Amino acid sequence: MNNKIEKNDNNFIYKIINEDFKKNKNLLLHTRFPPEPNGYLHIGHAKSICLNFELANVYNGYCNLRFDDTNPVKENIKYINSIKNDIKWLGYQWHKKVRYSSEYFPILYEYAKELIQKGLAYVDELTKEEIREYRGTLSTVGKNSPYRNRSITENLKLFEKMKKGEFKEGEACLRAKINMSSSFIVMRDPVLYRIIFSTHHQTKKKWCIYPTYDFAHCLSDSIEGITHSFCTLEFQDNKNLYNWILKNTSIKHYSKQYEFSRLNLEYSILSKRKISILIEKKIVNGWDDPRILTISGLRKKGYTASSIRDFCHRIGITKQNNLIEFSMLEYCIRKELNKKAIRTMAVLEPIKIFLYNIDNDHEEKLIVPNHPKHLHLGTHEIIFTNTIYIEREDFKEKYDKKYKRLKIGEEVRLRYAYIIKAEKIEKDESGNIIKIICFCDINSLGKKPINRKNPAVIHWIAVKNSFPAKFKLYNQLFKIKNPDQEKNFLSYLNSNSLIVKNGFVEKKIAQKIIKKMSNNFIKLFFQFERTGYFCVDEVDSKENKLVFNRTVSLKDSWNLKK
């Protein structure tokens, strides 16, 4: 795997690290990726994964995987397993064992007691609502809790009672004693521990008090010897608390936090809470729906690990929040698939063509390239007969001078085959076209037409060589560029985010896919000529009907359709 982050990159993180190496030539760079196991990873997490793991690789350091498992109510083993699989799939390996913040609960508890003993923490019995009210706002200072000046002895006893489960949830919490008038709201006596009676996936029922993210995060970083703790800009103010906790405990290693801009992508939302709403309302079909930008959703859609890494490298790391064009993500996968995807033909929404001057028993084998520019990818065989399918969109009954595909009295060339001319149509009782009767120029194979223009080319499949398939055409989930900024984001859903069409693929291609499905399935990518790049949906596909997910169109046509 190529690491695109290099020591000569002109970004602020590179400059910070190089300055640190100038000050300490023996510095061992140590980063970490610390997800909370309460959901699935998305493209925004991929940006952080690439940053942390590749910096460690480039600077010959280490990168830890640590689960920030401080809220047992929202966490689940299935998320842990999914996150580990996604990181490996992206091409990275963490340093030594997987780590958990819960491993450090005993020592975190001791650090909390140390703050109490220094008069820097107290047990508060205000309700959540009262704490919120006492905290104040950006324009008004907070006010002290009536429990703020309890003695050290009393606070130690009360904290022990919390640990023993002698308080109910919400009856007490441990707060840092900092400054209720601070201009940073996060520094207005933040909660360090709260009571949660819930079974933890790692520690089971050993604990009923749990450290908050802010308390556990900085101490876990320092316990592990993390030298550079990277997070997104929304945690910029939290750095003050990060540093305060480390400064006021006896921890030996002092980690440092640095912030970079989070990923904001056009026509998308990356908030776990909002994605959960989409799933609960059945707007999308779970966390691996290709319309949401989870790693599992992108993988199901046909995105490769290398294309996601390429995207993360291209957008770079900055301190300025900006909205990344969706077309850049599509460009990365389109560029890759253009090189390696097998070219084949698929017909969506088919209509039948009958070539009346070709014998019924005629069956001609044609050898076509798997990729016109990469001959090493080989060839495959297609069959030409007198009855074929073309796409309904490739025929127009009413005369239209601008229409360049098949119409009555006009010609088209069948891809890799002959020129045909439409002469008449057959309809059913409802007036729907069921068959187009055409003449086939049997002297046109591989030749330009004589004394007439070279016609447009359309794709096709012989009925005898067809295999039924379903095609899922995915588009952006939202109609506006930045739905994440809208309070009523559901009002901007794109009703055409998923269009399902039926049709056919080449039989021999289908047979190869089915054979691979019965063994260890390796994702297969295709360019269905004139249609787009597709992958096999290995979950929904059956032996009698394959399902294909459109990964990306052949060209960036989204902006043209809006």
From Swiss-Prot:
One of its GO terms (biological process) is glutaminyl-tRNA aminoacylation. It comes from the Bacteria. It holds the Pfam family tRNA-synt_1c. The keyword Aminoacyl-tRNA synthetase applies. It comes from Buchnera aphidicola subsp. Schizaphis graminum (strain Sg). Coiled coil: none annotated. The keyword Ligase applies. L-glutamine binds at residues 68, 213. Keywords: Aminoacyl-tRNA synthetase, ATP-binding, Cytoplasm, Ligase, Nucleotide-binding, Protein biosynthesis. GO terms for molecular function: ATP binding; glutamine-tRNA ligase activity. This is Glutamine--tRNA ligase. It is found in: Cytoplasm.
